[in-house]
Every structure is written in C-alpha cells, then in structure tokens.
Amino acid sequence: MDVNPTLLFLKVPAQNAISTTFPYTGDPPYSHGTGTGYTMDTVNRTHQYSEKGKWTTNTETGAPQLNPIDGPLPENHEPSGYAQTDCVLEAMAFLEESHPGIFENSCLETMEVVQQTRVDKLTQGRQTYDWTLNRNQPAATALANTIEVFRSNDLTANESGRLIDFLKDVMESMDKEEMEITTHFQRKRRIRDNMTKKMVTQRTIGKKKQRLNKKSYLIRALTLNTMTKDAERGKLKRRAIATPGMQIRGFVYFVETLARSICEKLEQSGLPVGGNEKKAKLANVVRKMMTNSQDTELSFTITGDNTKWNENQNPRMFLAMITYITRNQPDWFRNVLSIAPIMFSNKMARLGKGYMFESKSMKLRTQIPAEMLANIDLKYFNELTKKKIEKIRPLLIDGTASLSPGMMMGMFNMLSTVLGVSILNLGQKRYTKTTYWWDGLQSSDDFALIVNAPNHEGIQAGVDRFYRTCKLVGINMSKKKSYINRTGTFEFTSFFYRYGFVANFSMELPSFGVSGINESADMSIGVTVIKNNMINNDLGPATAQMALQLFIKDYRYTYRCHRGDTQIQTRRSFELKKLWEQTRSKAGLLVSDGGPNLYNIRNLHIPEVCLKWELMDEDYQGRLCNPLNPFVSHKEIESVNNAVVMPAHGPAKSMEYDAVATTHSWIPKRNRSILNTSQRGILEDEQMYQKCCNLFEKFFPSSSYRRPVGISSMVEAMVSRARIDARIDFESGRIKKEEFAEIMKICSTIEELRRQK
C-alpha cells in the first residue's frame, strides 16, 4: 500500500516539521571557475550603497576611496551605508551606562591577551592570502614566508615570538621605501626521456628576488584575496568571501578578542557561544519579555533579516567604536586596536583569477587575468559583464579594486555584533520614554527583535523606531524578508523557537555517514555523531537505532568489509573470509575485519576495540594492538581525538571522539603529484618545520613547542637543555665519561656553527 506522506504531519505542529523543508540532503552546490564576477558584484554593490559619500584619493597608493560616513540621512527604504558617527558613539555610551564597567574590564582582559599571545596564533586558520607569492597558501606557510621576508629586510622584532612584536614589524615594513621578496617561478624544458626515448616536459622550480616599492608593497599588505564561498545550500547565486593577508590578521585578532570579551558580557549576544548554551541564553531573553508583558501588554517577535550587512558596515565606524571603548586606556593599546579598522578603510580587493574565454570554432581557450581588465577591449564580454567592468574600472590598480567602504564577509563578526546589541539595548523604557519597549538577540548579521506595547499601534511604532535607529548606524533591516509573529514563535540563527526550541534535525544530516579518515576513526566518529544527536537534537531511540544500522551498512560498503559469512563479493572478501574461518570467537572481530556489529543505542560511548576486547582471540588481540606491528599508528596515542564534522550551516565544527590506536588507525600518505608543482618548495618548508618541532619535543617532552619561554631561540634552548640533561645523567652514573664529553663537544660545535652563520 502507498503511504500518503502528508498523513505523517497530521499530528505534528508545523514548527516541528520545519526540518523537512531544509535543503540539507545530498551534496551541497560547489562553485566552478573564477570568483572574479562575484567579487566585482560585491565591490560595485558596496559602492552603490554608499554612492552619496565623499570621494578622496589615498596619498600612498593612489587608490580612489569613497567615504559615506555622516552622509545624507536616508529618504527611502533602499539599503544604505551612511552611518552617523555621533549616533554610533551615543549608542556605545548608552550600552556602557546599562552595563557599568563593561568596556573597562574587557580592555583589561584584552591587554593581558595582547601581551601573552605568540605569533603562532596566526598559523591557525585555513587559506590565507600570501602577499609574497600573490596567491593563497595554508596559514602556517604564509606566516613563515612573511617572517622570512621581514627577516631578510632587517625587521627582527618578531624573533621573540610575541604577536605584538610581529605587528611592530608590520608597522615598520609599511614605512620602508622598498621591500625585497623571494618569489617562486617554474621553468619548463622539453627533454628526451632516457628510458622511453619520448619527449617529456621537465619542470624545475626557481626562486628569484624581486623588489617592491612602497606603493606596491602597501597595496599587497592591504589586499584581501577573494574566493567563491562553496557549499552554500538554499541559494541560487554564489557569493564572494575574502581572505586577508598576514599583515592584517594579527590586528584583526586583537580587535575581535576585545569584541568577544564584550559579547560574553552581553545577554543579547548570540556570539561567541553556540549550541545548547546559546539556546539557553536566547530562552532567557524570551522568558523575560513574556513575563513582563503581563495581561495588559502585547508582545510580538520579528524574525529579522538585514540587507547586505557586511556591505553597509563601515570600518570608519568601527574605528569610532574602538576609540570610544578604549578611551581611558594607554596609548600603545589604543594604537594597536585602531590599526585594523584603518587598514580596512584602505583595503584593496583582489579580483581573483580573471575570466576564461574559449573559441568554439578554433578550439582555443585563453585566460584573461584580472590585471588585464583595466584596459582590455570590452567587445569580447557579454552585456552583463561589460557593465560590471565599466563600473569597476576607475577603482582598479594592479588587478585589485580599491574598496574602502564595506567589510567583506566574516571579518569583524564580534565587533559588528556589539554594534547590533547597542541598538537592541536602546529599547529599554528608560530610553524609549514611551509605552513601547524592545529587546532581542543579535548574532553577527542575524537578529530577532521582541517588541512589547499596550496595543498594536504601539508595536508598530516600536518596530518603526527600531528600524530608523538601525538606519542611523548603517544597519538595514529588510522589510521584505523580516516577518512578525506573536512572541513564542520565531527563528534565530536557524534555531526555531516555539514555546521552547524545536530540534532542527536536518541541520545535522550532513555530518552522518562515513568520514573517510580511516577505519578506526570513521567507526568512532559515526557512532559519536549518533550519540551526540540523541543528547542534543531529539534523535529518538527508534530513529537512532535505524541511523546506526544505516551507518554500519554504509561503513561496510565504504571499506568493503562485509561480514565474513556473507555472499557479497568484493576485492577484500577473499582475505576476510579466510580470517573469519580461522577465528574461534567471531564476535570479537572488528566490523572492519568482517566481524558482526555489536553496537546498539546503549553502548555508543564505548570504542569498538574496548567493546569487543574480551571476545577477541588472543592472537587477534596481539596483531591488532601490538605497538611492534609496523601498521599500528605510532603517533602519540591520545585517548581523545578531534574530527571535523560539517553541520549544515556555520563553520565546520570540531567534534571529540575516543581514539584507540590499532592497525586500523593508519594515516594516508600525501599525494605525490604535489612534488612536481611549484608548491614543492612550500612542502619542503613544511617538512623542515615539522622536523624541527619533533626534535624540540624530544628535548622538552612535557612541553608543547608552541610556548617558547623567554627570548632564546629553539636551538639555544635545546643546546642548554642537552647540557643540563647530560650533566645529570653523568653524575647519576647513567652515562660514561666519554659519552658525556662527546655530548659537550657536539653542543659546542652547534654553537660555533650558529656564530659563524
């Protein structure tokens, strides 16, 4: 019989079925080709929102810049970026009045962080614009390259390893008349292969020195590279995101540290907490509003949406906020924090790879790099692209577009949240001085607004007042996309509230399944995801049991490890059948060795090896977990590992799972094809870095090499440690006199070599 799916929903409130409408099954859409068009859209839109501002020219780079601050007050509902400085400062003052000492305390906390943070903080994060090579690199490599270039240009403050000293170098580098950098390039040669006698292309990697004058260097230092945001569900159009270079990152980090510290103290802020903690925080605000709207008051909630949040924000506004927040602090601290917004006011957006053209008739393809867009004949482009290029041309310098207004995605999430909360804070009766009042929640560009008033007119007046107040600071509430409901039903950051939060289970769907790390980790992550969803997301016992069975099936197909007694034929079935027949206690075999599944929803918290240990044959135990077995991973065995899981929205989350090192926890080798590319130099650097760190950890087993103490270099630290250890070992009779003398001699040689270098 066919089941009519609508019957499933007869007894379910609509809000609880919300998760069935989310576009989270199947693969998310990825972008192909270049992001140049999306970036030009961003730049053009941002300028359009601020078009009535004042144009100036940057004296150092010659870049034209548009400043909309204190521009005309809006006359219509179009989004605009004309924030009024005095309004922003007043909102900050009222925020401080409602939370006495909040700025002062946050500044003190941040000052401590600024003095303690090491420069390796910048190695966190993924792709980073590497200004020395003019393209994206992993963060650690980009940082290493930057420090290397600084060093060769006589900037050495960063040797001590504090981030603040690295930032001093950045400031000094901007005053230099020229910077010398090393760039990588490829040489291709056609040579005859000795074995096959065919002609082959041989690539060699060369390094060459290049001098950048002050203007070119500044442009690179202020550049944000752009890419297309991938895997965005529920959208028809792609959009551009930015990755800043190393010069900007450190300054942004300190500003965000300050803003994060403020957000933690604001009850309306949805950042920096997440998950259940965030839900609890939100529920508190809703409870407060509903309790206060006694029988005499109405309470309504707006599920809010802001138009182009980032593109209407302005770094100059953030500078004003920081100036106010840090007003009683020492000058050095105020200066460090004001550099990020100043750099953003002068930022340049790199247009990406450019356009690809192909001629169908001549079977030709050619790449038009972004640098050429400034003076290429526009007849080759379609109308839409022509318009974009014409509009952006006055802003172009060296393939980058001057972009003074706007913020680019995800740069100052915390600080912009502080701005949003400061407007929510103005909804208290003592500020509105009338019968309506409001409160709400803010998390970056997402907000929920709760308005209370004695009657409908009051609610309308409250919403209007909020809307207009937002306009004054460059926040544009979208009247089309925001909707209002009786309080008790709303959505905020994809949490759906209906007299309490309903589980939006579909959001977690992408993290179910086999991760593809290795057999051991995948099994552990798979069951942990199911366990976590039973705890946090209303995954019921029956559904969880089904999810588990589907997972095991998926796992067996992925690793071709069907049960030893199955009829399914795969590449591995011959070996697994043999193992099955030799094994006395078949229940002890791991699923990945063709064993049965012993998991059910009661024992998901136990790693599979532990679950089956007592059931295993002795020789199987010996093979599986023997440290002398060359296939057992020899990484340090930690009881807890971290996996990256992809929830449906928001960044990839880190999830802990139990790790037991066995023959199944192998680590796949790096793809060899990288060795023939220009990335090879980078790979060698990375391996070198790895070797140094491993060596360092041998000398300081209890430490993590991330926290060097004092200002001695790693080598000096290791030499002095070696001398101390050797003396102790010699005096306690663990080593002979000759060995002790040899160690001392090696130490002296190392020091001598360092001096000569």
From Swiss-Prot:
Root EC class? transferase
Every RdRp catalytic domain range: 286-483
**One annotated GO molecular function:** RNA binding
**What Enzyme Commission number(s) apply to this enzyme?**
2.7.7.48
Record's catalysed reaction(s): RNA(n) + a ribonucleoside 5'-triphosphate = RNA(n+1) + diphosphate
Tell me the superkingdom of the source: Viruses
Protein location: Host nucleus; Host cytoplasm
Keywords annotated in UniProt: Eukaryotic host gene expression shutoff by virus, Eukaryotic host transcription shutoff by virus, Host cytoplasm, Host gene expression shutoff by virus, Host nucleus, Host-virus interaction, Inhibition of host RNA polymerase II by virus, Nucleotide-binding, Nucleotidyltransferase, Phosphoprotein, RNA-directed RNA polymerase, Transferase, Viral RNA replication, Viral transcription
The record's subunit annotation is: Influenza RNA polymerase is composed of three subunits: PB1, PB2 and PA. Interacts (via N-terminus) with PA (via C-terminus). Interacts (via C-terminus) with PB2 (via N-terminus); this interaction is essential for transcription initiation.
Protein name listed in UniProt:
RNA-directed RNA polymerase catalytic subunit
Tell me the organism's taxonomic lineage: Viruses, Riboviria, Orthornavirae, Negarnaviricota, Polyploviricotina
Point out the gene that encodes the protein. Answer: PB1
